[in-house]
Amino acid sequence: MNTYNYLIDELHILDDEIISYGKDKFKIELSLQERLKDKAPGKLILVTSINPTSSGEGKTTLSIGLAQGFKKNGKDVMLALREPSMGPVFGMKGGATGGGVSILEPSLDIDLHFNGDIHALTSANNLLSAIIDNHMYFGNELNIKDVYWQRALDVNDRSLREVKTKARDDKFTITAASEMMAILALARDFKDLKERLNNILIGTDKDGKDLFVSDLKCADSLALLLKDAIKPNLVFAKEMVPALVHAGPFANIAHGCNSVIATNTALKLADYVITEAGFGADLGMEKFLHIKQPHLYTKASVVVVVATIKALKLHGGVTESNLDEPNIEALSKGLENIEKHLENIKLFGLNSVVALNKFDTDSEEELQFLKNWARINHLNYGISEGYSKGGEGTKDLAKLVEKVAYEPSKFKRIYSNEENHEYKIRKIAENIYGAKDVIFSQQAKKKLNQYKHLEIPICIAKTPLSLSGDPKLKGRPRDFVLEISDIKVSLGANLLVVLTKGINTMPGLNNRPRALDFKLDDKGELI
C-alpha cells in the first residue's frame, strides 16, 4: 500500500468512492455524500483577509499552514480550497497553491491543467455559445435577438473583451468569472447541476421574451461535459494534510468560493474544515456568507482575517516599492483598514481571529507594535510562520482558532434575498464598503427594473485593492460614491451580478507577465 492509499484509508473513503488521476491526484465520487448523509458536520473555519497588495496576502498559504497546525496538534482537519485559474498563473499574481512549506502538491499540476475541470467548464461554456449561433444560423426558430451568453477562455486576454463576427458582436469572459464556473461551484449534486444549466438565461427573442437553455434543449450535453468536473478533487499538502480543491470563481468579478460539494464533503470527512473566500472580507467573505453558506451543512464557526505588515503599511500610505522598509507611522495609520474588516465580521454576528502572515522583512518593532495593538483592543491575535515552518509555525495559531470556534456566535445576514435589489446593493455598499452613496447608470437602472421580480442574492464585482470602487483609495475610504455601470443576471447560478465602474470580466496581462519567467530544461522540468 503506497502513502496515498494509506492516507485515503485514514479518511474513511471507500475504494469505489475514489478515482485516481495519476499517483497523487484524485477525485471523489458524489456517492460519498449520500453514504455519510447522517454524519454530523465538522466545524467550519472561514479564512479571509484585509484588502491585499497586488501580490496578495498569502491567504492560501496561511490556510494550508493553519491546517498543518491543526494536524500538528493532533486534530482531524481537512482543507476546502478553490482550484487555480491559469490566467493569474501566467499573469501578475502567480499560482494559488500556497508557498514554502505550506503548499499543495503537486503544485504545478494543480496550477495548470489539474484534473481537467476548467477545461471541461470552458468546453461546456463554448459549446453553448456554438449551439446558440448555430440555432440562429439555421432558421432561428426561437427568434433569438439579443444574446447575453458570452464565450469563455482560461487566459488573461484583453483583446477578447469585444469580438465582432459576421453574425453578431460577442465578448469573452475568463472561465473563472463565468456563470458556468459559478454553477459548478454552487450545485449541490448532479440533479441540481442539470436544473441550473436549464435555467441559464441565454438572451431574449424579438418580442423581449426571456430565453433559456431549456428552450434550446441542450442541458444534458452541457452536463455530459461536466459529469467528471462536478466531482471534487482530492490532493494533499506537505505534512500530508488532505485538501479538496474544487471550482475556482474569482472573488472580485465572481463569488469567490470553492464548491459547495467539496466543502460539504469535507464537513462529513473531518472534524475541522478550513476554507477560504477570495480577496478581502469586503468581497469573498460577504459573498461566502450571503451566497454560498445557505447551501452548506453548517455555518462558519469563526472567521480568520489574514493580514501582512506590508499590506497594512500600503494602506498607511507607503508605496509598494518601499514596503520592506520599517515604518511604524504608516503601519499605525494602515490599521484602519483591518479595523473596518473586523467591524464587518461583527455585523454578521461572527467571532474573528487576526492572523499575521509573517515575512522575514518584518521588523521586531513592527511585530511588537501589532501585538500591543491587538492586546489593547482585546482582539484574538496570532502569528503564522507556516511558509517557513509548516505546522510547527502555526500550531499556536491553530489552538487559538480552535478555541474561538467554540465560542458562541449568532450569524445574521446584512440583507434578505426578498428585499428590493437597490436596497440590497446599498446595504452592502454602505455597511460593508463604507460608501456614502451609490449611483446607477441608466443601463443599470433599466436592468434593476427588468429583474425586480427576482428574489436572489447580490454578487458585486469591484476592485479587491480598496474598500471602495477605486483601487487607489487605500486605508478606510470615507465619503466615496460607488458607481454601478451595469447589472447582469445569472439565473443558473441564481445571482444578480452588479458591475462597478471600470470592471472587466476578462482580465488583461500586466506589462511584465509571469509567462515570460518560466524556464524548462530539455526534459520538461522547471528550472
From Swiss-Prot:
Query: EC top class, in one word?
Result: ligase
Q: Which NCBIfam families match?
A: PRK13505.1
Q: Which Pfam families match?
A: FTHFS (PF01268)
Q: What is its EC number?
A: 6.3.4.3
Q: Which InterPro entries match?
A: Formate_THF_ligase, P-loop_NTPase
Report the sequence similarity comment from the record.
Belongs to the formate--tetrahydrofolate ligase family.
The entry's ATP-binding residues are: T53, S54, S55, G56, E57, G58, K59, T60
Name of the coding gene:
fhs
Catalytic activity, reaction form: (6S)-5,6,7,8-tetrahydrofolate + formate + ATP = (6R)-10-formyltetrahydrofolate + ADP + phosphate
Query: Which SUPFAM superfamilies does the protein's record reference?
Result: P-loop containing nucleoside triphosphate hydrolases
Q: Is Phosphoprotein among this UniProt entry's keywords?
A: no
Q: Name one GO molecular function term.
A: ATP binding
Q: Which UniProt keywords apply?
A: ATP-binding, Ligase, Nucleotide-binding, One-carbon metabolism
**What are the disulphide bonds in this sequence?**
none
Pathways involved: One-carbon metabolism; tetrahydrofolate interconversion
Q: GO:BP terms for this protein?
A: tetrahydrofolate interconversion
Name of the featured protein: Formate--tetrahydrofolate ligase
Specify the superkingdom: Bacteria
